Each structure stands twice: as C-alpha cells, then as structure tokens.
Amino acid sequence: MNAHVEQLEFQAEARQLLDLMVHSVYSNKDAFLRELISNASDALDKLRIEALRNKDLEVDTSDLHIEIDADKAARTLTVRDNGIGMAREEVVDLIGTLAKSGTAELRAQLREAKNAAASEELIGQFGIGFYSSFMVADKVQLLTRKAGESAATRWESSGEGTYTIESVEDAPQGTSVTLHLKPEDAEDDLHDYTSEWKIRNLVKKYSDFIAWPIRMDVERRTPASQEEGGEGGEETVTIETETLNSMKALWARPKEEVSEQEYKEFYKHVAHAWDDPLEIIAMKAEGTFEYQALLFIPSHAPFDLFDRDAHVGIQLYVKRVFIMGDCDQLMPEYLRFVKGVVDAQDMSLNVSREILQQDRQIKAIRRRLTKKVLSTIKDVQSSRPEDYRTFWTQFGRVLKEGLLSDIDNRETLLGISSFVSTYSEEEPTTLAEYVERMKDGQQQIFYATGETRQQLLKSPHLEAFKAKGYEVLLLTDPVDEVWVGMVPEFDGKPLQSVAKGEVDLSSEEDTSEAEREERQKEFADLLTWLQETLSDHVKEVRLSTRLTESPACLITDAFGMTPALARIYRASGQEVPVGKRILELNPSHPLVTGLRQAHQDRADDAEKSLAETAELLYGTALLAEGGALEDPARFAELLAERLARTL
C-alpha cells in the first residue's frame, strides 16, 4: 500500500540547473544515456563491495546487471539496475538538493560560459549528470529500494521546480529511472531514443567498456516459410534478451587495439567528465608486482581541486574486479587531479583502506605511477608546449605542493614547473631556461613572492634588479611562500629572495669600497637614531643596495619568515611568533638625504617632528610592499599634517 505523496521544492541551486537542462542549449543531448548507465554501474559496484564486506547483508549478487527498456508506444525509456539502491533520505539529498560545495561557483561559471561546449564541461565537472535526463525528457520517474531494506521510494518531477516523493512496497532491489521522452526534433538535436538502433549505437559509443552487462529485450521477426504458411502466412515475432556491451576491460586490451575515441569515452566514464583528456597513460608492469593502469590527465581542473576532502579519482581493481573508487593510496595528494584505474593481480579481494596504508605492493605501485605521470608531463612539456601551458595553467598550483611533500621527486617537479618572471610578460619560464639566461657572474636564482604580478613589479625590492637587468621570478601562489623555504637550490644555483637577507648588486663601476664606507659613516648617526626611534617596529635600520627609486623598503632576515608566510600559518591555526624586520634606506633618495640633514641640524624642539617623519617613512615602506598598516588612522593623521604644511 502506498504512503502519502509528498510534494517538495528543489533547492534553489537545483532549480537553476533544472532550468538549464529543460531549456537546454547543449549540442550533445545523447550523453544523458551515458550518465544514467554510469550511475547504474556505480550502484552495482557499491553493492558488490558492500556484500563482500557486510556478511549480514542478504542479497543475491550472482546476476548483477543493467537493463534498458524502450517503449515506443508510450515514448518512455527506462534504465534499471539491481545495485545498491537508495533510501528515501538519500534520494532527497542526492537528487532533490545539491548537497555539494561550490554550487554558487557553478552558477557563476555557467553564466560566464561562452558556449554550449563550455557549459557541458562545467556540468560534468560538478558531478550532476542525473540532471541531464531533463535534456530529453518532459518527466522523470525514479523507483529505488536500498539493499537490505524493505521500503522503496518513488520520486517524480517534470523539472519545473518541484518534485513528488512517496514510500512504496513490493519494489525490486536497485534503481530504475524512467524518462517520458520529449517529441523528436531534429533542429533541437532530439532523436528517437526508443529506437533499438539508436540505443545500440549510444551504448557502443559511450558505455561498451562498462564491467556489468547492459541488457535489452529486442524483437526478432522471422518471415513465415512457404511450407508453414505459404503466401498468406504471418511472420513470427520473438523477444530475445541481448547484451549490448562487450564488457572488455579497456586497460587490459593491447593499446594498438583500442581507439582514441574509446579511451576518451572511458575517461568520461571514470572521471564523470564531459570533455576530452589532455593526456592518456596506459601502462603494464610485470615482475614482482604485476598490475595494469590506465590513467588520464584532464584538460580542465575540477571546481573542487583545492578541497582536501575531494576525491582522488583512481579506482582500484584486483584481477578486473572493482575494489574501491577514489583510492588515495595510489597517488600522492599533489597529483589528485589524475583520473583512471589500476588493476593489481596479487591482492586480496576484501582489502580495506587501512590495509592499503601498510601494503608494500601498493606503495611500490604508487612510486611507479608517480614517476610515470611526472615523466609524461615532462614529455608533454618538451614535445607539445601549447598543451603543457594548458596543463600548467590548470594544475600548476597543485603540482607545486609536491615540492613540499615529495623529496624523492623534487628535482623532477622543479624541472616541469613554470614561473612568471620579469623576462616576459606573456610566456612563463622554467628554471632551466632561467639558468641559461643568467648574467655573467650571477650565482643565485632571484625570486619575489607576493599576491599579484602587478604588485610585485611595483615592489621597491625589485628596483635595483630591474635597473641592472637581473631576471626575477614572480611567485604569486600561496604555496610558493612555503616551498621556496624548503628548496635550497636548482642546478647548483641557490634560490635567493629579493626581500630577504643581504643582496649586494653593486659593482666597482658603481661605487668603490672606499666610497661605500664613507657613505656608511655619513649616515651612521641617522641609522642609529632611526633604530632607536622605530625600535617598536624594526630590529635594524641600514643602507640598501637594492633601492634605486624608493626611499625605503622592509626586508626579512635570510632565514626569517615573511609576513605573507606568517599569515598563511596563522590562517591554518598555527602559533607564529611576532618578528621584527629590517628597514633599508636608499641613501640617494632626497627624502633620506633630507632626513639625514634635518637630523644633523635639528633643534631641541624638532625631535617630535622628526620622529613622526620617521614613522611616516616606515609606513610608506610597509604600504609599498602591499602590507597593512598597524594604525592606519594615525598614519593618515600624520600625513594630513605634513600635507597641510606644504600649502
């Protein structure tokens, strides 16, 4: 007996996505069937694993399969599985709402998408393929019963902002999705999805490799023979159940037997993507540890790339039997964008994540896969620079995380990394290219860290470097602040921050040693006085060799923590001791020479005014590097007073 039918509203984000689907402008509406079959395959995988691990679950897993049922008269198409099924709350959570992070970002990106293809890619990235049913259907019905439970749930919607849900009895285990198809419309790319030929074609194109049988009842018409019915005899109609897919594990087939299109469709299945991969990696290892792997480097970064709880994307099989998805032990975290499958030969079928953490074979496979992925990226870098630039734009930030965690592959990672520099506004540079361009006598690789390229180019710290033609790497990702402190050198060249430690770019052509010593004596009194006056803010005041235009700048000790790095640590909840920095002065700047003269000629009542000038000098140095003033109101007050005196 059916329970009361409840009508509910879709979550706001879901309503907007439904509207996109119902009034779809997407060119590839055929992909809805791939999404439904992929969901059914996932449900079968989950049931098999659950039955293996939960001995109390009484289910029959001897004939797990997917069925497709097309009814031409009713214009319906049903995709049915006998997999894990869903409970009522799961239906509401997974379909009635979008219980995912990033929905606001998805809406924004969809609005900005330039064309249908871009929108399709975004929908795929956000993992909401079920909604694609509304591209071809006026109404969608879902019936599901979770394995081990008696009650089932029926869900129905026309995609107009509401849906109905009710509890039912006597439903088979698993899930069936029935689409009430829209009329055929060639102009809108709506085909006859009840056509046996069309269904066969789509399954072959998108889902031939699915590990579970995809079955469909088909009619077979046999003309009556002369002996049986003569000319007036009727043809015989029989119904046969056929398996539409080959179920061949793509990774187990020789590479020369697999077409590029088959690889692409398999990628879309395992990655839940709508676009093509940037690179395909097929490998087979024999010997102590035997395994096969089929990996993909995506073309676009997923929206949750920097979500630590996001899925890794590597599926683990043992002898072609699915064991688990998102096996994070098979790939380091900084390669979490890699998708694909690994099929091991010598491993228990009931392996758990806890066992995997200690498994020697898994660790060996992980090392080999990591090296293979990195070497593939290096090959792309050298042979297909445009594809490499695409890759680096999408995944460079996350790849640099490996410079912190993967010491064994650090040199390789440094080699395949690219950085913006002062050499070119448009083309990033590798460290090897930087080293090739180093000036005669240059021993260090110079870099600057900050929030944006524009901010760094205007930084006082770069003035002398630009004036003398030294190239400086401009590092603007938060991870850059961390890894530069852990990577001492590249190709024997130390990495040197332009804002840390002592940097002397002067030469005998600029000033002699005697001239520098004389200048130091001239400013000695001012430096001592400034250090006392600004002792609450700085640990030292000294003359600079890195300034040519600005009056002053703030730097950090060679092994000190930059303000940006301190902010990163504080944001992560770590205690960071407050450290004072060093104030460097440009001895050639009129403000500094004027301050020296004023300090030298000061009267007794001028001390306060000079101290305020020193405070303003410190504040301008802080602002020039993009820092935040400790007391903005006081700075504004002092500045207003000085400006008033000039009028």
Swiss-Prot record:
SMART domains: HATPase_c. Pfam families: HATPase_c_3, HSP90. It comes from the Bacteria. Residues 568-647 are annotated as: C. Residues 1-353 are annotated as: A. It is found in: Cytoplasm. GO terms for molecular function: ATP binding; ATP hydrolysis activity; ATP-dependent protein folding chaperone; unfolded protein binding. GO terms for biological process: cellular response to superoxide; DNA damage response; protein folding; response to heat. InterPro entries: HATPase_C_sf (IPR036890), Heat_shock_protein_90_CS (IPR019805), HSP90_C (IPR037196), Hsp90_fam (IPR001404), Hsp90_N (IPR020575), Ribosomal_Su5_D2-typ_SF (IPR020568). One of its GO terms (cellular component) is peptidoglycan-based cell wall. Residues 354-567 are annotated as: B. Keywords: ATP-binding, Chaperone, Cytoplasm, Nucleotide-binding, Stress response. Homodimer. Molecular chaperone. Has ATPase activity. NCBIfam families: PRK05218.1. Belongs to the heat shock protein 90 family. This is Chaperone protein HtpG.
